[in-house]
From Swiss-Prot:
Coiled-coil portions: 559-587, 630-760
Name by which UniProt lists this protein: Kinesin-like protein KIF20A
GO terms under biological process: microtubule bundle formation; microtubule-based movement; midbody abscission; mitotic cytokinesis; protein transport; regulation of cytokinesis
Gene source species: Bos taurus (Bovine)
Family classification: Belongs to the TRAFAC class myosin-kinesin ATPase superfamily. Kinesin family.
Residue ranges of the region described as Disordered: 823-863
Pfam families: Kinesin
Main localization, broad class: Golgi
Spans annotated as Globular: 761-888
Transmembrane domains' residue ranges: none
PANTHER family, A to Z: KINESIN FAMILY MEMBER 20B (PTHR47970:SF29), KINESIN-LIKE PROTEIN KIF11 (PTHR47970)
Length: 888
């Protein structure tokens, strides 16, 4: 028989057949009444009759089962004082977690964050005293019964490392877990009803493939190669009976105790006592009643794979010489259901074969030693059991039911794994578990808020993609939470409890009727619309409609009836089109309104953004201008300083040149004449320069005198300040006398220079010329001394003026307080402003501004009071006296 993928026939389901598709309400999104495009292809392989559906609760929904199991403490843990009462079972459904003193939750509670006690509700809680058999009978047994009736179930364990997950799934040789007990229950319940030959093999997610005799032989050899622990397929050329005999003598033995005392996995042959115990275990008469037709047969196939570091590996891969394992791909079929490509499905005839294949897969699984478990599984392992329901001779497409048991890897802190592969494994495990939590949270959010459906991130992890079919309607799921009561793992246990609390709030949607209306329903509806009299007949004979609806033969209808059906369908189609058009118009209006609102919001945001950018740019450029001003000020100050230094250097060079000229005087009358002429010209030039400076000094003195006179006129102090004014006037008169003396001395200096010039013209002797120059130098020195004395006198006058101005301001302030006149308030403000510069030292601006290089300063036009002018005059620095004659 050629290999081929079976597709469902066209008339497999009747018009009124009810298709039960249990799924989370959150994923359904109120689309239960919408007819799917390819309904028959979706429901032909996996379908459930009306009698197989579960009874919903009172509100029409059924919550996801979440069971919790607490493992007992080990003697070593009791010695480490791990029993601090942090896990307390209050009743069969409520668990209380009390934070121990060294936990992070307790420290957060002491800082006022969070709480120390948390309570969680589960479907049922099992304490440490509950055995494997009791746990299986109270939880998984009903699910196995549903699988035998045609439903799909996913059972997965969740918990921290070393919490008993693997023990719950697989158990030990003496006390099996839910997986071996499920296998035993399935095979014990289906005794005598198993299909003898594996001519149908599961393919993709919910399809089957026909196998010919050669392919059946290859499947048997593959299974024997796995059961015999590494023999090549070429060596298995003996008959099936002999192979089965060899299979009964050889095998592997594995003790799974990962959750209690660390997983101890050994690939060795079982002893005779162990074989007897296993045979006795499979012979237990634990069955469930299965009411099936007499010609119905079952074919059971199993697969076993793991997800390690986000890579898929087949654990039932035949042995080969290659050291590197082949990775598998996760694909989707034409209906969008995920499946593992090239995954090995092994046909099993009894529970013993399935148990041995499980041990072979466990031998290939990834294990490693961690700080919590000496032999911890570092991957998510998924063991799937598919049951093909074969009707008759197997020519009809079978119905497929599946039971998947997933042993999730334990969540663990990455900081406990310092580096290397363990750190990478822990990171991938935590990432996949976190993605699973996000998917469950999104499903719960969609369930609570049906108007706003969020995207469920199934594709963010390989684990969630494998679970996607069970979360979106292809089956049901159940969570078993394993809790470690140790105080050192309380924070991780609290996180696990919070995760399971979200999962416990998910619900399954009730069965939804999917199918097309029958022809008779159209006929009945059209008849009622055509003749109202038929409505009475329909009411009087309700059984007639039921009999008509049960008929499925279209050939019994006449042409007129079929035309009526066509007319009714046209009317229904027109009505649906009008409804869809109305919905389209409504949606377009809503979308346009939303777009307009979004554009307005966008425009407002852009304007606000531009204003903000404008303010930021203004501040930025103001700062840049300030920095530029400071840099220019510092630059020009440095330039002025360099100029002063150059002037000093030139003066020093000039002094050295004069000394050298005096030391090396040439002999002869010509040299002396030339030298005298040169000195005369230099003296004449200096005389003109001094004369110009003298004129500038006169102008400056005149302006200063005028300013002092203005100050005297503007200052009209009270009578109490007259003694101070008299003293100031005396000192000013003395200063003016000194100025007059200075002027007379300057005139004498000019006359002496003129006489020296005339003497130089008549007397060519070098000695007389030197005497004239010495006389000029003496006169210049005296002039410098006079100027210095005058400057000191002016300084004293300024100090007295400061004191008197302060006294005048205080007296004015006192008078204004006493009189309270409004006309003097402005003058009081000016006095207060003029008092502030008294705190600053006077500036270094020279009094005789024309003698030194200076930059023009801007006078303040805001304050022109006499007090402000007096204060501005204080800022002029003291004039440094220097030898004018030596400079030139």
């Amino acid at each position: 028989m050629s290999q081929g993928i079976l597709s469902p026939p066209a008339g497999l389901l009747s018009d009124e057949e009810v298709v039960v598709s249990p799924m989370f309400e959150s994923t359904a999104a109120d689309l239960g009444s919408v007819i799917r495009k390819d309904l028959l292809s979706d429901c032909s392989v996996i379908s459930t009759s009306l009698e197989d559906k579960q009874v919903p609760s009172e509100d029409g929904t059924e919550k996801v089962k979440v069971y919790l199991r607490v493992r007992p403490l080990l003697p070593s843990e009791l010695e480490r004082q791990e029993d601090q009462g942090c896990v307390c079972i209050e009743n069969m459904e409520t668990l209380a977690l009390q934070a121990p003193k060294d936990s992070f939750a307790q420290k957060s509670n002491e800082r006022g964050i969070g709480q120390a006690t948390h309570r969680f509700t589960f479907s049922q809680i099992f304490g440490p005293e509950v055995g494997q058999a009791s746990f299986f009978n109270l939880t998984v047994k009903e699910m196995v019964k549903d699988v035998l009736k045609g439903q799909n179930w996913l059972i997965y364990t969740y918990g921290v490392t070393n919490s008993g997950k693997t023990y719950t799934i697989q158990g030990t040789i003496k006390d099996g877990g839910i997986l071996p007990r499920s296998l035993a229950l399935i095979f014990n319940s289906l005794q005598g009803q198993l299909h003898p030959t594996p001519n149908l093999k599961p393919l993709f997610s919910n399809e089957v493939m026909w196998l010919d005799s050669k392919q059946i032989r290859q499947e048997e050899l593959k299974k024997l190669a796995l059961l015999n622990g590494g023999l090549q397929e070429e060596e298995l050329s003996t008959s099936l009976k002999k192979s089965v005999y060899i299979d009964s003598r050889m095998g592997t033995s594995t003790s799974f105790d990962s959750g209690i005392a660390g997983l101890s996995s050994s690939s060795q042959f079982p002893s005779s006592s162990q074989l007897d115990e296993m045979s006795h275990r499979w012979a237990q008469p634990d069955t469930v009643p299965v009411s099936v037709p007499a010609d119905l047969r079952f074919s059971i196939w199993i697969s076993f794979f793991e997800i390690y570091n986000e890579l898929l590996y087949d654990l039932l891969e035949p042995p080969s010489q290659q050291r590197k394992r082949q990775t598998l791909r996760l694909c989707e079929d034409q209906n969008g259901n995920p499946y593992v490509k090239d995954l090995n499905w092994i046909h099993v005839q009894d529970a013993e074969e399935a148990w041995k294949l499980l041990k072979v897969g466990r031998k290939n699984q990834s294990f490693a030693s961690t700080h919590l478990n000496q032999n911890s599984s570092r991957s998510h392992s998924i063991f799937s059991i598919r049951i093909l329901h074969l009707q008759g001779e197997g020519d009809i497409i079978p119905k497929i039911s599946e039971l998947s048991l997933c042993d999730l890897a334990g969540s663990e802190r990455c900081k406990d794994q310092k580096s290397g592969e363990r750190l990478k494994e822990a990171g991938n495990i935590n990432t996949s578990l976190h993605t699973l939590g996000r998917c469950i949270a999104a499903l719960r959010q969609n369930q609570q808020n049906r108007s706003k459906q969020n995207l469920v991130p199934f594709r963010d992890s390989k684990l969630t993609r494998v679970f996607q079919g069970f979360f979106t309607g292809r089956g049901r799921s159940c969570m078993i939470v394993n809790v470690n009561p140790c105080a050192s793992t309380y924070d991780e246990t609290l996180h696990v409890a919070k995760f399971s609390a979200i999962a416990s709030q998910l619900v399954h949607a009730p069965p939804v009727q999917l199918g097309f209306p029958s022809i008779h329903s159209f006929l009945k509806e059209h008849s009622l619309r055509a003749s109202p009299s038929l409505e009475t007949g329909a009411k009087t004979d309700p059984g007639l409609g039921d009999d008509i609806e049960n008929e499925v033969d279209i050939s019994t209808y006449g042409k007129e009836e079929l035309l009526q059906v066509v007319e009714a369908m046209k009317a229904l189609l027109l009505k649906e089109r009008q409804e869809k058009l109305r919905l389209e118009v409504q949606l377009r209006d809503e979308i346009c309104n939303e777009m307009v609102e979004q554009m307005q919001q966008r425009e407002q945001w852009c304007s606000e953004h531009l204003d903000t950018q404008k303010e930021l740019l203004e501040e930025l450029y103001e700062d840049k201008l300030t920095i530029l001003k400071e840099s220019l000020t510092s630059f020009y100050q440095e330039e002025l300083q360099e100029r002063d230094e150059k002037i000093k250097e030139l003066e020093a060079l000039l002094q050295e040149a004069r000394q050298q000229q005096v030391a090396h005087q040439p002999s002869g009358s010509e040299l002396s004449l030339r030298r005298s002429q040169r000195l005369t010209s230099v003296s004449t030039q200096q005389f003109h320069e001094i004369k110009a400076k003298l004129e500038q000094c006169k102008a400056e003195l005149n302006s200063t005198t005028e300013e002092l006179q203005k100050y005297q006129k503007m200052l009209e102090p009270p009578p109490s300040a007259k003694p101070f004014i008299v003293d100031v006037d005396k000192k000013l008169e003395e200063g003016q006398k000194n100025i007059r003396l200075l002027r007379t001395e300057l005139q004498k200096l000019g006359e002496s220079l003129q006489s020296a010039e005339r003497a130089c013209c008549h007397n060519t002797g070098a000695g007389k010329l030197r005497q004239a120059l010495a006389t000029c130098d003496d006169i210049l020195i005296k002039q410098d001394q006079t100027l210095a004395e005058l400057q000191n006198n002016m300084t004293l006058v300024k100090l007295d003026l400061r004191k008197k101005a302060a006294c005048i301001a205080e007296q004015y302030h006192t008078v204004l307080k006493l009189q309270g006149q409004a006309s003097t308030k402005k003058r009081l403000g000016a006095n207060q402003e003029n008092q502030q510069p008294n705190q600053q030292p006077p500036g270094k601006k020279p009094f005789l501004r024309n003698l030194l290089p200076r930059t023009p300063t801007c006078q303040s036009s805001t304050d022109c009071s006499p007090y402000a002018r007096i204060l501005r005059s204080r800022r002029s620095p003291l004039l440094k006296s220097g030898p004018f004659g030596k400079k030139y």
